[in-house]
Structure formats: structure tokens, C-alpha cells
């Protein structure tokens, strides 16, 4: 099976066309692709006047244009790849509610028969089981100081709202709890298969401090919002053949036990600025 992996496209700033010149079977979108709330607030055009305005590039507010850009992007991906697997990053939930954002993305992806949005979900393609989720961090294994400090340090906890707790923003304790539930979900799924079954984990936050760029290695607290140390989990589950992530805007490709861990982020592009991430638009992974 041939897989193309991309993450951190940030289509809210600029468009991109992901091609399939190598005949890949699966495209993985490992998070931070678009903002879910934009899709909810700006549904697809329903009349010819709106469609004409979009075609001409007129009459669009920024967020409406972003929503249409994302829908067009999904259409192109659906056309060019036999299968598309998409997990949300943290940016997907900006300016909206967490669980509502998941629902919005499920709804958009469900419009295409070969695009699968995963959040504590699986998709079987040929003989490979794909397990996907944002996989938030454990905040340095629920370290109290990290939980307290991240609330003031990261945008996630200022502009993502919690759905069921009144009008409050997401907290580090919320994501640490979500991390625990996702890992338990992955374990439960794998326990239901024979040991020779091949798995691919599609996530956004990183599963190892090996995905930390050296220039940030000293920042223990902030790294708690980017990385979790899942080395033992990975070593205990050698049936995971590939683990993809995004979030950090630096590419990584390394092995833990029998699991290949890969990150291939584009990063920000806007108004002539192109972030130097070192991403590979022609990457092909094999499982």
C-alpha cells in the first residue's frame, strides 16, 4: 500500500493542490488543514447567484472564502486519491466548540464516499486498519505545573470552547483526559485483532519527544502541549507499522521498535511568505 502524508496545510491562509503522480492508494491529512467553524458558519452556496460570485471570486468574506477553499480542496483530494483519511489538528477547532467541530468535519467529509474523518474511529483499507484521532497530549503526564502553565501559554485554551460546561474555554485537563480516552480506544481496537494484523495510527500531536526540534528541546512546559512520550505504548504494540502526526512544523522520520513515525508539514504560506519547514510534497510511504 502506497501512502502520501501531509499535515499543517493551514488552508485558512493559502490554497494548495495535492497531486497523486505516484499512484498512491491513500492520502493522509494529519491535521491543521482548515478551521471547522468556517464550514458551519458558511454552508455551500445554494443558488446560482452565490455560485457565480464564488466562481468570480467576488462577494466573499474571508471566512466564507476559506470555507469554499476547504470544500474545493476536499473535492480535488477525493478525485485524485482512492482513499483520503483526515484527522483534525488543534487549529480545526479554533473559534468554535470542540465536539461541535468534530461533528462539522464529519458532515463535510461524509459528502464524499472515499473521504473518512476519524476521531477515535477506524477505517479498514485492504488489509490495513487505520486508527485516527487528534490525539491531544497528556500535558507531561498530567503534571500539575504544566496543566496550570499551558492554560496561559497556548492559544488553544483561549479560543477553543468547551461544549458542555457553560461558556468556558477548553482547559489542559480536558485535552489530557481526551488523550487518555484515545489511547484506550486504540488499545481496545488492537486487542480485538490477531497480533499479525497491520495498523496505521493517524494523529496530529506528536507521540514522542524525538519529534521535538533541537531548538525547542529545553522548553519542558511548552513541549507538554506538543508532545507525549508514547514510546512504551508503541513498543508494546509492534503491529503498528506506521504512525503519522503533524503539529510541529518540522519534518521527522524515525523508527521506534518496528513502528515508523513520520511527520510531513507544509506550514504557513500567505502573501508571498512561505514557512521553511522542509516538507516533501512528493513523499510516498509504504505499508
Describe the residue ranges of each PLM region:
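Binuclear metal-dependent phosphoesterase catalytic core
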Residues: 23, 124, 213, 222-241, ...
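Active-site-proximal loop/helix segment associated with metal-binding centers of metalloenzymes
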Residues: 131-200, 205-220
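Short amphipathic alpha-helices and their capping/turn segments at secondary-structure boundaries
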Residues: 14-22, 72-76, 117-126, 131, ...
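Beta-strand-turn-beta hairpins that frame and shape the catalytic cleft
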Residues: 1-4, 122-132, 155, 198, ...
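Active-site environment of divalent metal-dependent phosphoester hydrolases
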Residues: 10-16, 34-38, 91-101, 122-124, ...
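N-terminal active-site segment of His-dependent metallophosphoesterases
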Residues: 1-86, 93-100, 165-172
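Active-site neighborhood of phospho(di)ester-bond hydrolases with catalytic His/Asp-centered motifs
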Residues: 5-7, 27-32, 85-90, 116-120, ...
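A basic- and aromatic-enriched beta-loop-alpha substructure that forms the phosphate/nucleotide-
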Residues: 83-147
Amino acid at each position: 500500500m502506497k501512502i502520501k502524508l501531509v499535515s499543517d496545510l493551514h488552508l485558512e491562509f493559502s490554497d494548495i493542490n495535492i497531486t497523486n503522480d505516484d499512484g498512491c492508494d491513500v492520502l493522509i491529512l494529519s491535521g491543521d488543514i482548515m478551521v471547522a467553524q468556517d464550514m458551519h458558519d458558511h454552508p455551500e452556496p445554494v443558488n446560482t447567484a452565490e455560485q457565480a460570485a464564488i466562481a468570480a471570486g467576488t462577494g466573499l468574506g474571508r471566512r466564507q472564502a476559506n470555507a469554499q477553499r476547504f470544500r474545493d480542496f476536499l473535492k480535488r483530494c477525493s478525485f485524485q486519491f482512492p482513499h483520503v483519511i483526515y484527522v483534525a489538528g488543534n487549529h480545526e477547532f479554533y473559534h468554535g466548540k470542540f465536539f461541535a467541530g468534530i461533528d462539522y468535519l464529519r458532515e463535510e467529509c461524509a459528502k464524499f464516499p472515499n473521504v473518512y474523518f476519524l476521531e477515535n474511529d477506524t477505517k479498514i483499507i485492504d488489509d490495513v486498519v487505520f486508527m485516527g484521532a487528534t490525539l491531544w497530549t497528556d500535558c507531561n503526564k498530567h503534571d500539575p505545573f504544566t496543566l496550570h502553565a499551558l492554560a496561559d501559554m497556548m492559544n488553544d485554551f483561549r479560543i477553543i470552547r468547551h461544549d458542555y460546561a457553560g461558556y468556558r474555554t477548553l482547559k489542559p485537563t480536558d485535552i489530557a483526559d481526551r488523550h487518555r480516552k484515545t489511547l484506550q480506544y486504540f488499545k481496545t481496537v488492537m486487542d480485538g485483532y490477531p497480533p499479525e494484523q497491520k495498523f496505521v495510527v493517524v494523529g496530529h500531536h506528536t507521540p514522542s519527544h524525538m519529534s521535538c526540534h533541537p531548538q525547542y528541546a529545553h522548553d519542558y512546559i511548552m513541549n507538554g502541549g506538543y508532545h507525549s512520550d508514547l514510546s512504551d505504548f508503541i513498543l508494546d504494540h509492534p503491529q503498528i507499522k506506521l504512525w503519522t502526526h503533524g503539529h510541529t512544523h518540522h519534518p521527522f522520520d524515525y523508527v521506534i521498535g518496528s513502528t515508523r513515525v513520520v511527520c510531513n508539514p507544509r506550514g504557513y504560506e500567505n502573501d508571498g511568505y512561505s514557512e521553511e519547514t522542509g516538507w516533501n510534497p512528493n513523499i510516498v510511504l509504504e505499508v
